[in-house]
Amino acid sequence: MPSAKQEEDLLVVARPEGLYCPPGDFYIDPWRPVARAVITHAHSDHARPGHAHYLAHVDSAGTLRARLGRDIPLQTLPYGEAIEHHGVRVSLHPAGHVLGSAQVRLEHGGRVWVASGDYKTEPDGTCPPFEPVPCDTFITESTFGLPIYRWPAQAVLFAQIDAWWRANAEAGRASVLFCYAFGKAQRILHGVDASIGPIVVHGAVEPLNAVYRAAGVALPPTLRADDADVDAALLKRALVLAPPSAQGSPWMRRFGNYADAFASGWMQLRGTRRRRGVDRGFVMSDHADWPGLQQAIAGTGAERVFVTHGSVQVMVRWLGENGLDAQAFRTEYGDEDDQETSRGSGSGQTACDADAGSPHPDLPPAGEGEAP
């Protein structure tokens, strides 16, 4: 734990409970129960149960209440509106990660810090795009903080998914696409060509679709697999969105001779598709890729950067080589984007974070890889 003098010099410090703002006496995305928590978004590694008070963006209310309970003590803010707590001015700004995701801007004593949470720099239409917020100190993730990670453009990605779905529909087999139920599933729904066929979703996905629709995000009509209208003929033309936990489960038997695929940033790596046991892999992430991380950090104008999780040491070294004061915060954030990095961690940290920011265990030699 930092000394009192160190805490005086920092607006955010790492404590056993989470990232703590000493002058404001509150935490940002704490992983242990605290009195006051500012939540950047509703993924379970950032929004934990048990806090006495939550502050989040208004569009996170639906997902937070769905995941943590209808009666959680939740205060919400729109983007850009500031409140003051113990002399710290706090405001939330778009992070572009999932619905309601926010960067937390802190202003106190002439200093400005921004804690970004998780973010993505390419707009996807399901949430306001990432907004660079000028600051002195920026706290960044680094989930995909290696030069190998470069995402295809949104239009290219969905052309690939549509072509795969269309070919399967013409062959009379369902297209099962495994993806995370919150964020990625809705992004896929928003981006695919719904004229190709019906869209069926797992029961874990549909409640979150309702939250997105209530927030005004345009999603095509969806059916649940157990709806009366869903029969064998319909399924032969359908796109089916399901969480990774459904793979190999009895729930999958209803689809007969189906084609399957997995949507994840980890599909950039050699061997991931094979290990997942699917026919196709689509390189898709709700986190920034390597160029996106560089763009976001540069856009803040910050002279000091703290890196929280992912390829921490690689990012810290690169930032230092480029003239910034770069340090690491050790955290317990996981990776909602995919569970590939959490094998054996056991603490909610990614394997990268648990190993002090070492590259993904499946990273090919010399940083080379291939998209499946």
Regions found by a protein language model. Name each.
Residues A4-R32, R36, A42-V176, G183, ...:
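His/Asp/Glu-rich metal-coordinating catalytic cores
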Residues F158-R237, L241:
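Hard-cation-handling environments
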Residues H53-A61, I139, G197-L208, F262:
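Short internal beta-strands
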Residues V58, P73-P78, I196-G203, G323-E332:
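Short hydrophobic/aromatic-enriched beta-strand-loop microsegments
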Residues P2-K5, A194, A225-D355, P372:
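C-terminal regulatory/interaction regions
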Residues A42, D59, V98, G117-Y119, ...:
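Active-site metal-binding loops of divalent metal-dependent hydrolases
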Residues G367-G369:
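Glycine-biased, low-complexity coil/linker segments
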Residues D9-D29, A214-A238, A242-W251:
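A short, well-structured beta->alpha microelement
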